[in-house]
Amino acid sequence: QKPDSFLMAEIYEEARYREYLQMGKMDALYHKVGLYDTLRDIICYGHSSDRIDFVQEPLRDIAPQMLHFLENHDEQRIASEGFAGEARYGLPAMTLTAHLSEAAVMLYFGQEVGEPAREHAGFAMPTRTSIFDYIGVPAHQGWVNGKRYDGGGLTPEQASLRDFYCRLLRLPIKGNFQNIHRYNREHTSYYNDKVYSFVREEKQRKWIIIVNFSREDTFGFDLQIPPVLR
């Protein structure tokens, strides 16, 4: 009756992803088990960026139907003490998850201004914005600014973060994914598993995306593009 409806499912059994898409007729699935969990482990525990390939490669045929995110109503806020501790530490992962494929990306309200969810709401505990309690979202309220919606209540850091998100999500990045991470791991001096790189290619336009997950270190290397992509 409503052909424009969009059906999204939470399913945490990777072996059943295609079943939900093909038989269940879902339009998209949360990419929680796999990409979100991997990126969280990289951010929080310094796990190897090589793991990204292991979770993405088996899903290439359904990648456009996997919904990417770093925050939602269930998960801890990036800026919370239970996750990264500061919103800026999530920016490399957000850059990657927003443009890794043709998949849609979800931005949870308040994420773009670094909401840390420190409030003791009652039923829910800090680190998550409660969906069970009547509770404010202070960073988001700073953007609302008394219904003026001009960001007048944001700190300079929050305003800068929001500007980053606005610019990131407006980038017209499209096209096929090309993995150059593995090639550089094998052929490039000083390239390591704290960074990740890939190419998005559409007709004559190529986007080269490189992210550095390390909180402390920067790395100098000459990124190489495989001959087949030149």
What positions do the PLM features span?
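Loop/helix patches that line or flank the sugar-binding groove of alpha-linked glycan CAZymes
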Residues: 50-52, 60-63, 72, 77-230
